[in-house]
């Protein structure tokens, strides 16, 4: 692009850190002067303002973790929302072709791609930035451009790839009408850009810059892109033979290629090797707490004794860690993002944590989960299926016969010794006792204790450390004529800090979006290896060419990926029989990801890439019987279909549709299969 070409700089503030997110999101403030790119990219402030505009396009409909307004795909078969009428049912029926929810992702992503491309083509030196800083800024722009393409590819399927210099806005619509590239072409471009970005980006960020990517983030996203490319949805999927361009070009590979799994495994191995060598990334763990400091921070509960794991320190066992706190603290804001070695990439808080009215923030996400007692909306619920998926304390599966066997059995002072693997209070149904630590860090079951320690006003202090009930007639139970109640009778505790409260002078702790975690890399590695045929070896060069990996279905390497995640959770590793059997191992990985990444948007896309979504999202949603009051509490826990949450799945819902407005602008764009085209 000509350096003397004048462009309008849509500027936002410089900050990308946690303390300035409210300013960062104020994208309505524009820098009105028209300035040449030469002047802009020779000035540090203007350059960083330009880059900040690119970051702003990661917000809104491009968020990956949030409440239903911006992240409806954070609600698969695991969690639901009960607000604003039939929005959930419409989403589940795929009635969102030309609705505003989620459709801005296309435009916002290409805005970010275009602006990042201009920066990459114009910024080579800057009088106020050191050469190292210039390289890092270029790396950030390159990462963002690749990440926007990745978000588009995952959601919409194959997408147009603009020229590296960016589209020339002076051209007519017809001249800018690019068709979709094939899925493999998209993957090749995105991964190659991430490899370059990995050589440009800084390795570490402080807490004020935590929302900026690092070398590790580039390598991790690269692994994620390769994993999706190897998955059944886009690897030899003949059911997508009709996903074509207008000239008839097929966009989804029709022949299965096992080597793609080897590439995915090698890419994950790249990140694992880099993490271990640099010491920058690992699973977060919290040391054993020998003495309770507060009711909200209890003494460590040791998992049931296991001869192999109970006496070994992490990662070979759990003797020196608190599995419950290790998982809970990952998400609830008790540790600074920059001090969390598991967090590879995050958007930060996505808003101002001090303003409880701010939309699209992690704080607002939590407010949707909080009971009305504590000033929350009380509209996010967990499905019965998800609550049943959590194991018992010893790692065995939850037995659905318990609904009959334990009918009428509740905790009390006399049976405390029978449920020593939890901190459940009295009056709680027995099915919620003796469960694995991740259950108690994630599930707000009926009778769970909410701490709300930040309450300051005298009128609310008695509500600290309070049990919340969802029985009909209870303060937070079913309310006729209102949306503000937990429709499944099972709430969500994940992301909630013991201090969180939205009334009585309380506040909700600042917390960051867990966009990409090291646990994901480990489980991706194991999954990819599992899909390689027994006895087959692939030689794959590392991302930087420094070594060659011998990739095969190596059970010990698969264990290297799974075991640390299980040890951190306080549950036993899989048996040798599971590691030996690819089908059984896949079933375990599906389950492990369902639990480990609950409410992180992973489930929605995992089910699709595995091509098992129809059997999961197509089934009816069950919950507790919220029509029952406390007098009939034994009936509350008998599973019932939640009639208000109608759901279905059709083939078209594998990918999102392109809106009519975008199809009008680009005559060369084809619509995703099953969706109405614009003629």
Where in the sequence are the language-model features?
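Membrane-proximal, proline-rich intrinsically disordered regions
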Residues: 21-69, 419, 430-433, 663-679
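Extended amphipathic alpha-helical segments enriched in small hydrophobics
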Residues: 146, 222-223, 510-572
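Conserved, well-structured interaction surfaces
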Residues: 43-62, 82-156, 173-215, 428, ...
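Short coil/turn linking the two alpha-helices of tandem helical-hairpin repeats
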Residues: 153-154, 158-160, 205, 228-237, ...
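Bacterial Sec-dependent N-terminal signal peptides
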Residues: 1-29
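Segments forming glycine/polar-rich beta-alpha architectures that bind adenosine-containing cofactors
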Residues: 344-347, 353-449
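Long, intrinsically disordered, low-complexity segments
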Residues: 21, 109, 189, 265, ...
């Amino acid at each position: 692009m000509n350096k003397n070409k004048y462009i309008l700089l849509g500027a936002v503030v410089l900050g990308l850190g946690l303390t300035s997110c409210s300013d960062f999101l104020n994208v309505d403030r524009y820098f009105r002067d028209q300035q040449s790119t030469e002047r802009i990219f020779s000035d540090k402030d203007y350059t960083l303002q330009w880059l900040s505009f690119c970051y702003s396009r990661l917000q809104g409909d491009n968020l990956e973790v949030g409440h239903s307004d911006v992240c409806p795909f954070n609600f698969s078969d695991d969690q639901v929302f009960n607000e604003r009428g039939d929005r959930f049912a419409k989403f589940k029926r795929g009635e969102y072709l030309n609705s505003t929810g989620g459709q801005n992702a296309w435009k916002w992503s290409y805005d970010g791609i275009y602006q990042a491309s201009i920066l990459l083509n114009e910024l080579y030196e800057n009088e106020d930035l050191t050469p190292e800083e210039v390289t890092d800024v270029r790396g950030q722009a390159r990462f963002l451009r690749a990440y926007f393409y990745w978000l588009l590819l995952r959601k919409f399927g194959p997408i147009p790839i603009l020229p590296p210099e960016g589209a020339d806005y002076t051209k007519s619509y017809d001249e800018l009408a690019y068709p979709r590239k094939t899925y493999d072409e998209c993957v090749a471009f995105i991964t190659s850009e991430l490899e370059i970005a990995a050589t440009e980006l800084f390795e570490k960020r402080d807490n004020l810059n935590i929302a900026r990517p690092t070398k590790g983030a580039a390598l991790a996203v690269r692994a994620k892109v390769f994993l999706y490319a190897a998955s059944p949805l886009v690897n030899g999927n003949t059911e997508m033979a009709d996903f074509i361009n207008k000239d008839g070009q097929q966009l989804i590979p029709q022949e299965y290629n096992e080597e793609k799994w080897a590439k995915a495994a090698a890419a994950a191995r790249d990140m694992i090797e880099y993490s271990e060598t640099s010491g920058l990334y690992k699973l977060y763990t919290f040391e054993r707490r020998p003495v309770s400091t507060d009711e909200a921070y209890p003494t460590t509960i040791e998992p049931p004794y296991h001869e192999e794991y109970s006496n070994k320190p992490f990662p070979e066992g759990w003797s020196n860690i608190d599995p419950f706190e290790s998982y809970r603290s990952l998400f609830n804001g008790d540790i600074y993002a920059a001090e969390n070695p598991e967090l590879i990439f995050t958007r930060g808080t996505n808003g101002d944590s001090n303003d409880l009215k701010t939309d699209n923030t992690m704080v607002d996400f939590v407010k949707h989960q909080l009971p009305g007692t504590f000033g929350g909306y009380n509209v996010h619920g967990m499905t019965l299926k998800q609550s049943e998926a959590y194991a018992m304390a010893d790692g065995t599966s939850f037995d659905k016969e318990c609904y009959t066997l334990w009918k009428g059995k509740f905790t009390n002072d006399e049976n405390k010794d029978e449920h020593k693997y939890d901190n459940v209070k009295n009056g709680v149904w027995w099915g919620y006792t003796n469960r694995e630590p991740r259950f108690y860090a994630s599930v707000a079951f009926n009778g769970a204790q909410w701490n709300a320690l930040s309450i300051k006003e005298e009128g609310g202090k008695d509500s600290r450390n309070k049990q919340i009930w969802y029985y009909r007639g209870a303060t937070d139970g079913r309310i006729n004529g209102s949306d503000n109640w937990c429709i499944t009778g099972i709430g969500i505790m994940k992301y909630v800090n013991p201090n969180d409260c939205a009334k009585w002078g309380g506040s909700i702790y600042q917390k960051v979006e867990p966009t990409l975690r090291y646990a994901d890399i480990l489980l991706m590695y194991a999954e990819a290896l599992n899909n390689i045929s027994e006895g087959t070896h692939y030689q794959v060069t590392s991302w930087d060419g420094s070594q060659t990996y011998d990739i095969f279905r190596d059970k010990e390497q698969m264990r290297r990926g799974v075991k640390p995640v299980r040890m951190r959770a306080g549950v036993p590793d899989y048996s040798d029989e599971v590691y030996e059997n690819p089908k059984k191992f896949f079933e375990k990985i599906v389950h492990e990801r369902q639990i480990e990444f609950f409410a992180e948007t992973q489930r929605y896309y995992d089910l699709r890439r595995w091509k098992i979504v129809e059997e999961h999202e197509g089934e009816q949603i069950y919950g507790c019987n919220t029509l029952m009051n406390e007098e009939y509490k034994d009936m509350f826990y008998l599973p019932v279909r939640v009639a208000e949450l109608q759901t279905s799945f059709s083939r078209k819902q594998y990918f999102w549709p392109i809106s009519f407005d975008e199809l009008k602008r680009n005559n060369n764009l084809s619509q995703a299969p099953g969706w109405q085209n614009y003629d």
